[in-house]
Each structure stands twice: as C-alpha cells, then as structure tokens.
From Swiss-Prot:
Domain of life: Bacteria
Chief localization: membrane
Zinc-finger found in the keyword field: no
Species: Streptococcus sanguinis (strain SK36)
Molecular function per GO: metal ion binding; phospho-N-acetylmuramoyl-pentapeptide-transferase activity
Enzyme class: transferase
InterPro entries the UniProt entry points to: Glycosyl_transferase_4, PNAcMuramoyl-5peptid_Trfase, PNAcMuramoyl-5peptid_Trfase_CS
Topology in membrane: Multi-pass membrane protein
Reaction equations catalysed: UDP-N-acetyl-alpha-D-muramoyl-L-alanyl-gamma-D-glutamyl-L-lysyl-D-alanyl-D-alanine + di-trans,octa-cis-undecaprenyl phosphate = Mur2Ac(oyl-L-Ala-gamma-D-Glu-L-Lys-D-Ala-D-Ala)-di-trans,octa-cis-undecaprenyl diphosphate + UMP
Entry's transmembrane regions: 3-23, 51-71, 75-95, 115-135, 140-160, 172-192, 197-217, 223-243, 248-268, 306-326
Subcellular location: Cell membrane
Name this polypeptide is given: Phospho-N-acetylmuramoyl-pentapeptide-transferase
UniProt gene name: mraY
Amino acid sequence: MLIALIAGIVTFILTIIGIPAFIRFYHKARITGQQMHEDVKQHQAKAGTPTMGGTVFLLTSVLASFVIGLFSHQLSNGLIMILFILVLYGVVGFLDDFLKVFRKINEGLNPKQKLFLQLVGGVVFYFFYNQHGAGDQLNIFTVPVQLGFLYVFFVLFWLIGFSNAVNLTDGIDGLASISVVISLVAYAVIAVEQKRFDILIVIISMIGGLLGFFVFNHKPAKIFMGDVGSLALGGMLAAISISLHQEWTLLLIGIVYVFETTSVMMQVTYFKLTGGKRIFRMTPVHHHFELGGLTGHGKEWSEWKVDFFFWGIGIVGSLLTLAILYL
C-alpha cells in the first residue's frame, strides 16, 4: 500500500515538473498545436493550445510503476500486461497526434490503421494473459460465464472499445482526466480488496500523473492530453478490469465513457435512418450540454458545469459498483 502511494507521489511530482517543460518546448519549437474543427464557438479560442501532454504523464507513470514494482518485488505479470497496454496504445495515440500536429494530416491515422494497431496490441495482451493461467471465464456480477475461444474476441472488444470511448470523452478541459481518476479510485478499492497490490501500484501512479496533469488541463487548459493520453487511458482501464477479473464493472465505473460512445452511435444511426435528423445538438454528448443544457435547447452550460455533471455521473457509477460488490 505504501509502495503504491510512493509511486503516485513520484508520478505527481514528475508530471508537475514535466508539463511546464513540455509546454515551453512546444512554444519554443513553434509547433502549431491543437486544431479546432468543432462547431462549439467557445472552443475556437483554444486553437493552437499545446497537445500531446499525455506523453508526460504516460512516461512518468510507466517508468515509476516499473521501477517501483521491480524494486518492491511486485513486478507481476498483471502489472506488466497493464504497462504493455499503456505503452502500446500510447504509441498508437502518439502516431495519430504526430501526423496531425507535425505532418498536418488532419485525420492522423486513418480508422483502419488505428484499428489494426489496437488489434495487434489486444491480441498480444490476450495471449500473454492466457498463457499465465487467466482462463476464458467472464465474471458477470457473481456469475461465472465460460466463453471458451470467444473470450479473445471479448478482450479485443473491451480494450479497443474503451480505448476509443475515453478518446471521445476527451473533448473539454479536464473532463477525461478527472473522469479517469474517479474510475481509477474505484479500481484501487477493488485491487485492495483482492490484495492485488501489484496492480495498485500502476493505478495509484496514474492517479498521481493525472492529478499533476489536471493542474494544467483544467479550464482554461494550457495543454491537452491528445490521443497519446486518451487511447492509453481507455486501454488501461479495460486491462485493469480484465486483470482483476471484474470486467463487467467497467460498464458502471466507466459509465461516462459508455454514455459518450452510445450518444455518438445513436446520433449516427438516427441521422442515417431519418435522412439528416439529429437526436442531440452535437455529439459526443458533452457538447450537447455545452450548447443548450440538459435539453440541448436551453441556456448554454459552461465547461466547468459540464465537467461536474459528468464527474458526478462517474462517482455515482463507481459507488454503485462498489456497493454491488461489497455491501
């Protein structure tokens, strides 16, 4: 427990130091920064804001977790698998950001390229996970379900789905970073209950990194995490839920990401079926609230108000999960 707290403190301090240096490098190198293509007027002023800040908290968290795990003899297969997903999905996000920022390719990696790289990471994760006796059992609440060979498809769906879901959530200042902190706190409780102090190290380490990042990412954001951060964080949450054998919990602990992704799917489907009509003003759904409150046609919500609304949903989902598990 103490080792995990040390990892969190180390990562927090390194991120607090690293982010300003990263921002200075960005400005000194005259890098263009974040481009804004959204129809939300409030966001146009953010054009040029440094991005790829996830590189900092990702590197500090992975290094701190690896070194502290190694010296505390907690560098288990479970910890290594989560670090692997963080690194690999972080690399996918880094390539995507690099193409957008440095090569001026607005799309970054195309969907097929991104999916292929995420699939490769997911397949490697599954086979490593399976080789160490994890089995093919999916726990739904307290009911074990044997999936057999289908479990590999579930793992791929879980990793890729939540990786992209957190990416969709990262649309306004501070929203994704604190939403993930809330999710990680819930998984920290589960890890402690299971006495998985190895996994607790990377959980607390990332919490420290995200809190350090939030100092510069809250409104008005001085830096964005970019795909390098959001894709890695989503993959990490999925990997943690799998490693703790509590996969179903991510549907509630990650209810914010589920809500955001579902809103996009509903919008696209309805738009195609009705020949151009919309359910929401704009998706992901946090933009709907920005533009017109709960109904989408009322008074605009500030980014802080949207943040607190979604963080509240995340807290409720996490508390409900813990209540189901332990009460």
